Design a protein with these regions (language model features):
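Noncatalytic regulatory segments and standalone regulatory/sensor domains
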Residues: 148, 152-167, 173-214
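Active-site-adjacent structural segments surrounding the nucleophilic cysteine of cysteine proteases
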Residues: 2-101, 144-146, 152-166
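Loop/turn elements at helix/coil->beta-strand transitions in domains of secreted/extracellular proteins
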Residues: 110-112, 134-139, 179-182, 209
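Structural recognition of the beta-strand scaffold that forms the well-ordered cores
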Residues: 40, 137-142, 174, 184-186
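Active-site-proximal beta-strand/loop segments in catalytic clefts of secreted hydrolases
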Residues: 46, 65, 119, 141-145, ...
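Mid-length scaffold segments of soluble, non-membrane domains
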Residues: 87-126, 130-133
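Extracytoplasmic
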Residues: 36, 134-135, 168-170
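Short, solvent-exposed, low-complexity loop/linker segments
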Residues: 128-138, 142-150
Length: 214
């Protein structure tokens, strides 16, 4: 009981401290998935991280040369992008591992001593730490409308043999800043906006705490 109380107290103090910290904005350059990639939010978000770190490479180049793709049927988004991000009707999504590996393929091919990391499972305070102390933006998996996750009737089987439903409103955004109880995100469809910290935390956790950093 004492341990539970101590952990709750730490969380409360951390949240209160977050509401008091000054605003930190990283000034990530906005990139948009449309018109060329109506289902390419993940690679567009990665493109923003690449440009922030000084690599002048386009989302199209990253997608065409380094992003692993899978077919449309029973494909696992943990291993590759399902379908074609250039297509409105035949493009779905991928999770963090293929996006991190896409960047790492680019780094290896060009002898660049950088590493992209799949940070799936990172706490929301880990996301804040990346922004405030490391001064690095974070790609996170979110929803396209800021509403709770919704699912298609279709599913896939993961590497553990578990059947998982496919999201119908999955989206990818870049966390660009924090402060005063708000989180600044750059949406590849809508551009930059601020969302309430509690709302951001709730959706981030509902979407599996998926994240990529460089």
């Amino acid at each position: 009981m004492k341990k539970l109380f101590r952990n709750l107290l730490i969380i409360i103090i951390a949240v209160l401290a977050f509401y008091l910290i000054p605003i930190r904005e990283l000034n990530v350059k906005e990139e948009y998935q449309n018109p060329s990639m109506p289902n390419g939010c993940e690679i567009t978000a990665l493109d923003m991280l690449m440009k922030y770190n000084g690599f002048n490479v386009s989302k199209e180049y990253l997608n065409d040369n380094y992003l692993n793709k899978t077919g449309l049927y029973n494909a696992d988004p943990n291993t590759g992008y399902i379908g074609n991000p250039y297509s409105k009707s035949k493009g779905f999504y991928c999770y963090a591992a293929p996006i991190a590996e896409c960047a790492n393929k680019y780094f290896r091919e060009n002898n660049i001593s950088k590493t992209a990391k799949d940070k799936t499972g990172m706490s929301v305070f880990g996301v804040l730490n990346q922004i405030i102390f490391r001064k690095q933006p974070v790609v996170v998996w979110y929803t396209v409308d800021g509403k709770k996750p919704e699912f298609l009737s279709a599913s896939y089987t993961n590497s553990k043999g578990e059947k998982k439903p496919l999201y119908s409103n999955l989206h990818c955004v870049v966390v660009n800043g924090v402060g005063r109880g708000m989180v600044s995100i750059i949406d590849p469809q809508r551009g930059q906006r601020a969302v309430n910290f509690i709302e951001f935390t709730k959706l981030y956790m509902q979407m599996g705490q998926r994240a990529v950093v460089i």
